Amino acid sequence: MTVDAPNRKQTIGIPTAILFMCGQNSIRSPMAEAIAKSLLQPDIYIQSAGVRSGEPDPFVDVVLEEVGLSLNHRRPHRPRTLEEIEDDFFDLIVTLAPEAHHVALELTRSSAVDVVYWPTMDPTVVTGTREQMLDAYRQVRDHLWKLIDKRMKPIRRPPPASG
């Protein structure tokens, strides 16, 4: 995959194409993609990918459904790698795991693409009851929600009209 930056809006620093990356595209990056698609303007192109392709994680569906979101909005989510992304023109890559950050920096070293690292815990390291494990996934969801909401305010969807 080559990662090139488009010229659309880039001069004013507002991303028009965002890629979220993690290790396997099964938890953190698809969760961030779903949240971003719900919070950001619909004309922002948003995708997610992993360094490797993992397996879908049902806990992600559970914690997203709790807030009215779904990975399966238009088609079932299938974890994918960078090579499987159809459109590779991103002007912002948000990495959520150290390995993904290193890969993104390597891929973009000769491109005008902004790469930012948002350290995000891997909820699969938490053991215990089902509820304890779900709490770890909720923490990741809420962490990503706050980061996207705070750091991408200029491209947020306008609030619904009241009345």
For each predicted feature, which ranges?
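Short polar/charged helix/loop
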Residues: 2-163
